[in-house]
A protein has these predicted regions:
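Glycine-rich, acidic/polar active-site loops that bind/position phosphate-bearing ligands
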Residues: 2-446
Length: 446
């Protein structure tokens, strides 16, 4: 394979052509994720995969959400064989995540490259981050106008036994595939909104979690389509219903990967001093973090939502942390880990992990204090809290917070940060210039 792939950080020990022969794979989807979380791929016949593993598949980067122009040369997506997954529902095809390269250099703004760079930075400090995610989704009608199950109408539908069994064929098929892939899925449930579901699998190293997260979204959408449905991870697809979160569970392990350095039963909530410093970094950068964990205009309809039909939004709106209490931005459910409840379903799988690690690493290095612990119901008593910062009210506020957070931008890389801010500002400008019926209703006769 040559040394080139080693310097790009891709796996040169696994021969994809041999993988194809052994698994009867006819095609490979060489896939990368752009800055907006869009999954881009080329379908490559197995006969050509050896050349692709050597040289990469060519893409016009400008045609996707990257800060490139038509004048840029081809961007090469070099498959990282360590990520290859044979599609359980279409076994003659395999999916493989790619490393984006241009002019024999890494494309620094590419999300997976950004994550790998941050992971390497943490590893230099002897830290290996392991994470798990809870990617909620709705099963809706093909045209996106309504939930797909006309009988799913309960005002409190969470854990609804009848509703989850009416979608047994879809949920069980996805779970069967995760079992086949060795992900260790351990529970599936109907979530707090009508038509909403969550499926959980075992935590892993941050890059593996991001690759699985990316593939999970592809798989869920594919299986839903197979059953004549549509799956959406949109943060707030229906007014009045609970939105789609993507909660992240975080722990840090030593160089061996066997000792959880966040775990200390002698400390408050079983979270070590290093764990509290990592948490301190999350709290310190929270408002800037939102630009990436909550990356769309619609995201702020979730974290700043009024009371939903079920009685709670299950989303934070203040920068606060607590013990086993789901009304805050961060929950410490038990020793050795914490849950960040801020991210939503639109979060880019790679950037979500990258920004968590970057903020936490800064917290450890600066010995950041997470601040006061709140043990109140923020949904009922949040109005009494006057000393906790509020999360951004909209995407523009979040982008401004991110732009002003110099240390976080540096940690994620100047090229990435500049590209992300530029394209997201364009997205906000497009939204802000959109004329709405609300404006007519409230202004026509003024």
């Amino acid at each position: 394979m040559g040394l080139g792939r080693q310097k790009w950080g891709t796996d040169v020990t696994k021969d994809l052509a041999e993988f194809a022969r052994a698994k009867n794979v006819k095609y490979f989807m060489i896939s990368y994720t752009d800055l907006f979380g869009g999954q881009r791929a080329k379908l490559v016949p197995a006969q050509a995969i050896a050349d692709m593993q050597k040289d990469g598949a060519g893409f016009a980067g400008f045609a996707t959400w990257l800060d490139l122009t038509p004048a840029h040369p081809d961007m090469l997506a070099v498959p990282d064989a360590s990520s290859v997954i044979q599609l359980p529902w279409k076994p003659d095809v395999a999916w493989v995540a790619a490393t984006c390269v241009m002019d024999d250099k890494l494309v620094d703004q590419a999300p997976r490259n950004t994550l790998k760079r941050v992971i390497e930075e943490a590893a230099r400090d002897g830290m290996h981050v392991k994470t798990g995610i809870e990617a909620e989704f709705f099963l809706i009608s093909p045209d996106g106008s309504a939930i797909s199950d006309q009988y799913d109408t309960a005002s409190k539908p969470c854990y609804d036994q009848q509703a989850v069994m009416r979608r047994y064929d879809v949920i069980a098929e996805i779970c069967d595939h995760m079992l086949e892939l060795g992900w260790g899925p351990y529970q599936n449930d109907h979530e707090d909104a009508n038509g909403q579901f969550e499926m959980n699998w075992t935590f892993d190293h941050a890059l593996a979690t991001a690759d699985k997260h990316s593939f999970f979204k592809f798989m869920v959408k594919s299986i839903a389509e197979k059953h004549g449905l549509r799956a959406t991870f949109m943060p707030k697809p229906f007014q009045g219903l609970t939105g789609n979160g993507c909660h992240a569970h975080i722990s840090v392990w030593d160089e061996t990967g066997k000792t959880n350095v966040f775990a200390d039963k002698s400390e408050e909530l079983g979270l070590s001093a290093k764990g509290k410093n990592f948490l301190g970094g999350i709290m310190k950068h929270a408002s800037a973090l939102a630009a990436i964990t909550n990356p769309t205009v619609n995201s702020y309809k979730r974290i700043n939502a009024p009371r939903t039909i079920s009685g709670a939004t299950w989303a934070p709106n203040t920068v606060t942390w607590t013990g086993n209490n789901r009304t805050h931005m961060v929950r410490v459910p038990g020793p050795g880990r914490f849950e960040l409840r801020l991210p939503d379903g639109a979060a880019n799988p790679y950037l979500l992990q990258a920004v968590i690690i970057a903020a936490g690493l800064d917290g450890i290095r600066s010995k950041a204090d997470p601040g006061k612990r709140y043990d109140i119901d923020m949904y009922q008593l949040g109005h009494t809290v006057t000393d906790a910062p509020k999360l951004p009210l909209n995407l523009l506020d979040a982008l401004r917070e991110f732009d002003n957070d110099k240390s976080l931008k540096t940690a994620l890389g100047e090229e990435f940060s500049s590209a992300y801010l530029k394209l997201k500002q364009q997205e906000w400008n497009s939204y802000a210039s959109h004329f709405t019926q609300w404006e007519r209703d409230h202004t026509l006769d003024i």
